[in-house]
Amino acid sequence: MEEGKLIHLTLAGIKEAVSKYGTFPMIQPGGFVLEDATFEFNEPATEDQIRKLESHFNVSLPKDYKEFLALHNGLEFLDGIEILSIEDVMKYNETEDLPEKCFLIGYHFDGRYVIDSNRYEKGDLDYLFYLDSIDHFDEAVDLKANFEIWFDRLLSSNGNKYWEVERDVKAYYENIDE
């Protein structure tokens, strides 16, 4: 599949589920059902707004991220995850201490999502990172994903941090009991 197509499919799936069920049905580990997961889609960004963001950071934005912005200039979803609007990306990055050409694009409860456009501009599609609230970029988790694959995986895991899934059977049971 061509880069930038998956984001269209994922967003269409969300909208279909919300339209059909009135919400996005979610099941958390241990069978906990969260029935009122919400999605608040922003209006599309204009081409001028997208160019302004690229100019602001002196970067070429990843194709799939630009596709998302052209469809929805930001999104709040799953009761605690936010993909920032272009205006908020520029605003919130004023206080971030990130390497050149790296910028914050969203939040996951108390963590942050960061694009490393240095990687993208070199042809590497694994450009998305996750930082806990107090982490510095050198402590970031490499999500081994681009924007649309991260978004698809995050939704497939019902908003859980899929990169932190416990693989040890005993520890998995212990985490559910907590």
Give the positions of each predicted feature.
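A C-terminal-region feature
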Residues: 1-48, 71-178
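Amphipathic alpha-helical segments within well-ordered protein domains
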Residues: 50-54
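A glycine-rich, hydrophobic loop/mini-helix early in the fold
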Residues: 64-69
